[in-house]
């Protein structure tokens, strides 16, 4: 690795140390269904997002609720002296990407078979702080 590339990589690594984020990999739900729930909480304050997820009837909301609680715990671990209410935490970014696909065969007429794709997804949540000048993910 070149010197400039190493310096930018080190700078990026230092910037990520102050960011609180959480990832959920290979969640066995289709990305399309997970995005419906993720769009509900994108940009919301953390307590409001938890209420939305808690009272949603979608199955994906249960998994996202646990992920939001995890990212809050990560933020508290990185900022032990800060108060969560005073920081004004909100969901800065939430991304849902496609994950691994399990390919299965379903019998079809006349001896053929159709391929079934069982999809999974990866979810990443980054927190932001309203009252802090430094961006916290």
From Swiss-Prot:
Tree of life domain: Bacteria
Pfam family, one: Ribosomal_L22
CDD domains (UniProt xref): Ribosomal_L22
Coiled-coil intervals, chain numbering: none
KW Ribosomal protein (keyword) present: yes
GO process annotations (BP): translation
A GO MF label: structural constituent of ribosome
Record-linked NCBIfam families: rplV_bact
Function, as annotated: This protein binds specifically to 23S rRNA; its binding is stimulated by other ribosomal proteins, e.g. L4, L17, and L20. It is important during the early stages of 50S assembly. It makes multiple contacts with different domains of the 23S rRNA in the assembled 50S subunit and ribosome. The globular domain of the protein is located near the polypeptide exit tunnel on the outside of the subunit, while an extended beta-hairpin is found that lines the wall of the exit tunnel in the center of the 70S ribosome.
Record's protein name: Large ribosomal subunit protein uL22
UniProt organism field: Flavobacterium psychrophilum (strain ATCC 49511 / DSM 21280 / CIP 103535 / JIP02/86)
